[in-house]
Amino acid sequence: MLNINGGKLFMKKILVTLIARVLSTGVSFGADHKANIIVVTHGSDTDAFWGVVRNGVEAAKADTGADVQYRNPPTGDLNEMASLIEAAIAQKPDGIVVSIPAPDILGGPIKAAVAAGIPVISMNSGAGVSKSLGAVMHVGQPEYEAGLGGGEKSKGLGGKNSVCFNHEPMNTALKDRCQGFADGMGEKLNMVEVSSDFDDIKNTVIAHMSSNPDTGAIMAVGPTGCDPTIAALKEMGKAGKVVLGCFDLGPAIVDGIIDGTVNYAIDQQQFLQGYVPVVVLHLNHRNGTLPGNSINSGPGFVTKGNVELVKKLAGKER
């Protein structure tokens, strides 16, 4: 079993403590040191996951006093996101934060930002290509390893004949999650692409389960896919009878863990993905410092044994 819990969670607590200490040293962040930072993500307006990321961005803005703007394509359109990055470059900010779900579409604008002398930090997706595109660091979780840990856990719980539902098939990070999950299960990848619509996903899950009644393990790569999967399993009377793992947290996933429908969630702590890059770019603008390495915000397992610890923060800071 891949151990992705204790040590890394402890390191994340240390990271937050160190940042808090830097921000509370008593040194004033005056006007001369005020950084202009633009955050551009691919998260759609309807995806609750990105609301938590934005909460992290806003918290960092408040803590540092930096001028921070958050931008995203309302529907998650990646070509529109590329245009948003290009528009950000034209403003000549002191730093840009980006997610990189599709390097083939977003790589050009990111390289252009770097060529213009703008420090870029990638977050959430793009860990594998971040350095090659010129980003100074990445804040996120190693997606394949996270999926691998999930697959090993599902297999250990007796799951077999697995399926991975992917609501963002263009996102390489989510493909990595599914591949890791399959490898952890010791099975061939069975990835089913779905839309981001709740009812469509629910109906797809029901149809798949009806056509493949021997399915014993499901992975949903985010709340967008997990929430309707929970509803589908309950409607079919299969809640608690199929091993269900989900990436990320939200109210429905937390409730699902408590009632036994969801066996575990893989938490990447997206609040940190919004918070840390802003703080790092602000401090880089102020005194020229950068961390020596990228920062893993996750992964870690949330199960019935520890869910109460994170319940109050789900959908807000986790």
Question: What function would you assign to each model-found segment?
Answer:
Residues A48-T64, A146-G150, T172-L189, T204, ...:
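Short, solvent-exposed amphipathic alpha-helices that sit
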Residues M81, M137-S162, I201-K202, L249-I253, ...:
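Hydrophobic alpha-helical segments within soluble ligand-binding/sensing domains
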Residues E86, D94-V114, F181, N190, ...:
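Hydrophobic alpha-helical
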Residues P103-E145, G159, D248-N263, L309-L313:
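Flexible loop/hinge segments that line or gate small-molecule binding clefts
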Residues H33, G184-K188, L272-R318:
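Hinge/cleft segment of the Venus flytrap/periplasmic-binding protein
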Residues T17-G26:
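Bacterial N-terminal signal peptides
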Residues N36-T64, Q69-I85, Q91, S99-P103, ...:
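Extracytoplasmic "Venus flytrap"
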Residues A62-T75, N161-C164, F181-D199:
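Short beta-strand elements in bilobed, periplasmic/extracellular small-molecule ligand-binding domains
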